């Protein structure tokens, strides 16, 4: 979703005014569990943006101090998914995970319902091709209307993961709108 980084409450308010409410106010820190820690909030109006930005900026999330927030247009959400890439050191391959259990802690899903996560292992030398991505999306049971958008986003996520030499990239949630559009 289009959005803007804000380092102050005033910048958050200005971003929300430019984007138009409702918006999401999201802590930008290098750790998981932002939502659980109060670092992701829906703001229906500018007063709520001001309140949430005030509360989130300076918040400690897992030992990380929040110094900036991301303000983005809120979306109509029909379904939420989780998508990620990380390195599976034992397999010496990249591990992609895609699950309809988006918006929650993926560690809990992996523990309690491992079959809810569609996994692929990608050889770093070969990379992730479109056919493999389509099969992965099919294994995760995304609706037909979401396939094209999901394939595009997941291939871009893999490129960001490899080009950025990352240990982990994730989208949570990957959003499916009532109109069948997919976006982050």
For the regions a protein language model found, what residue spans apply to each?
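Glycine-rich phosphate-binding loop of ATP-grasp-fold ATP-dependent ligases
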Residues: 1-3, 25-52, 82, 106, ...
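Short beta-strand-to-turn element immediately C-terminal to the catalytic PLP-Schiff-base lysine
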Residues: 6, 41-45, 86, 97-99, ...
């Amino acid at each position: 979703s289009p959005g803007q980084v804000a380092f102050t409450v005033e910048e958050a308010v200005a971003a929300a005014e430019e984007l138009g409410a409702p918006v999401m106010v999201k802590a930008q820190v290098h750790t998981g569990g932002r939502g659980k820690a109060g670092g992701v909030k829906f703001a229906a109006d500018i007063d709520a943006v001001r309140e949430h930005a005030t509360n989130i900026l300076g918040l400690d999330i897992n030992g990380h101090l929040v110094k900036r927030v991301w303000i983005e247009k809120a979306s109509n959400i029909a379904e939420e998914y989780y998508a990620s890439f990380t390195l599976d050191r034992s397999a010496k391959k990249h591990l992609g995970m895609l699950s309809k259990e988006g918006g929650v802690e993926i560690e809990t899903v992996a523990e309690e319902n491992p079959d809810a996560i569609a996994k692929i292992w990608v050889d770093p030398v070969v990379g992730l091709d479109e056919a493999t991505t389509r099969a992965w999306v099919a294994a995760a049971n995304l609706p037909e209307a979401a396939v094209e958008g999901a394939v595009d986003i997941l291939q871009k996520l893999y490129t960001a993961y490899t080009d950025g030499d990352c240990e982990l990239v994730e989208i949570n949630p990957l959003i499916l709108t009532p109109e069948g559009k997919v976006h982050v």
